[in-house]
Each structure stands twice: as C-alpha cells, then as structure tokens.
C-alpha cells in the first residue's frame, strides 16, 4: 500500500510539474500546440474512417455503454 501511495504522489507531482512548465512555456509553443491540435484532428478523421469499417465489431459494446450511461 505504501509503495502505491508513493508512486501515486510521484505521478501527481509530475503531472502538476509538467502542467506548470506547459503553462509557463505556452506562449513559445503555441504554434507547436496548434500543429499538434491540427495533427490530432487529422488523426481523428483517419480513425473515423477506420471506425466505419470496424463499426460491426465496436457497435455492440458502444450500445451497452450508452445504455449504462443513461441509467
């Protein structure tokens, strides 16, 4: 239990630390950020195309998720 707690604190500290760095450096990496968002958007489009091909596999679990959420 102690090991899990320490690793959790480490992860928490790291995430806060990295957020702080991103926040302070956001002005200099704003262009890079926009590129990343654009690439992620294009990636999402590509995944959507694949998704339509795999819908027959994914659909059942997706429907179950929707019904779980509404209850």
Curated annotation (Swiss-Prot):
<dbReference type="GO" id="GO:0007268">
    <property type="term" value="P:chemical synaptic transmission"/>
</dbReference>
<comment type="similarity">
    <text>Belongs to the melanin-concentrating hormone family.</text>
</comment>
<dbReference type="GO" id="GO:0030354">
    <property type="term" value="F:melanin-concentrating hormone activity"/>
</dbReference>
<dbReference type="GO" id="GO:0045202">
    <property type="term" value="C:synapse"/>
</dbReference>
<dbReference type="InterPro" id="IPR005456">
    <property type="entry name" value="Prepro-melanin_conc_hormone"/>
</dbReference>
<dbReference type="GO" id="GO:0031777">
    <property type="term" value="F:type 1 melanin-concentrating hormone receptor binding"/>
</dbReference>
<dbReference type="GO" id="GO:0005576">
    <property type="term" value="C:extracellular region"/>
</dbReference>
<keyword id="KW-0964">Secreted</keyword>
<keyword id="KW-0732">Signal</keyword>
<protein>
    <recommendedName>
        <fullName>Pro-MCH</fullName>
    </recommendedName>
</protein>
<feature type="signal peptide">
    <location>
        <begin position="1"/>
        <end position="20"/>
    </location>
</feature>
